[in-house]
């Protein structure tokens, strides 16, 4: 099957650009967002969490003060483009306007409208492989405000219930100096059974019965994160820039788990952008059939 796409309604998210290549399905919202709301091997379940009821949102008074009366940010699910460090309400921009897009063969470009107040303009450029379950997701962040701003591109993959995510610990020989970062958030309970750590990997699982969230971050020098769910391995690779300043005390990857979903997040270095300047960050995606639940089988995804 050759690569093809059509625009159609999907769930409660409105119109989506629905891309298929015989191996993989990838849907992107264009009535809002954008969000990469569906990602799966053909015949397998969606790897992305979908909040079909639009029940998870922020509409606090300070958010409405900044973005307008009635403003509401919905998580929706799927992959989204944010800017780190996280701030409330600035980060929770209510991206509910239609998204312009272009298609050039296997390259799909989505232009979110310029954000009011922050002045950020976000563009997603998705290149889908012609025949294999692979895609490149380029994030371009442009400072369209009238002031210099500092931020990092933050790609958040909101994956479905039941998943487990892993990253490899940094193993560079730095002699007498520390070689890895492991950042913890205030709400973490360190005896939480969702959290996994051995000499090689750090992992986090999703549990629908969890009462508290759990979040960890690390300096992912290997540039690889893997999420296992629904008989599928979702591998995300990025470039790590040694010596660069990363958000959250040096994190280039973060994982967040709650009762609804599991997030696998990648971050670019922090960039200081003058008006009109832009930076970019690329995630490369691959999907594999994977039925093993044995951590010993993870190594093949980190070679």
Describe the function of each predicted region.
Residues 1-136, 140-303:
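Surface-exposed acidic/polar loop and edge beta-strand patches at domain peripheries
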């Amino acid at each position: 099957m050759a690569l093809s796409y059509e625009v159609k309604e999907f769930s409660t998210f409105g119109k989506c650009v629905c891309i298929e290549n015989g191996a993989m399905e990838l849907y992107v919202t264009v009535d809002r967002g954008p969000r990469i709301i569906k990602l799966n091997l053909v015949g397998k379940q969606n790897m992305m969490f979908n909040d079909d009821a639009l029940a998870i949102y922020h509409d606090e008074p300070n958010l409405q003060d900044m973005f307008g009366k009635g403003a509401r940010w919905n998580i929706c699910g799927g992959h989204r483009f944010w800017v780190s460090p996280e701030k409330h309400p600035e980060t929770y921009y209510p991206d509910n306007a239609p998204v312009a897009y272009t298609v050039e063969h296997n390259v799909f470009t989505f232009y979110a409208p310029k954000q009011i107040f922050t002045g950020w303009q976000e563009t997603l450029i998705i290149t889908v492989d012609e025949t294999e379950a692979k895609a490149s997701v380029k994030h371009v962040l442009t400072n369209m405000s009238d002031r210099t701003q500092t931020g990092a591109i933050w790609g958040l993959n909101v994956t479905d219930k039941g998943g487990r995510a892993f990253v490899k610990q940094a193993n560079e020989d730095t002699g007498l100096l520390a070689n890895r970062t492991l950042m913890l958030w205030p709400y973490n309970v360190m005896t939480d059974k969702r959290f996994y750590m051995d000499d090689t990997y750090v992992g986090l699982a999703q549990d629908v019965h969890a009462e508290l969230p759990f979040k960890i971050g690390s300096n992912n020098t290997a540039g690889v994160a893997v999420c296992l769910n629904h008989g599928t391995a979702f591998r995300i690779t990025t470039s790590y820039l040694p010596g660069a300043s990363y958000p959250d005390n040096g994190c280039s990857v973060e994982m967040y788990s709650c009762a609804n979903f599991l997030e696998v997040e990648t971050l670019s270095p922090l960039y200081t952008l003058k008006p009109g300047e832009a930076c970019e960050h690329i995630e490369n995606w691959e999907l594999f059939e994977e039925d093993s639940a044995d951590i010993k089988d993870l190594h093949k995804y980190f070679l």
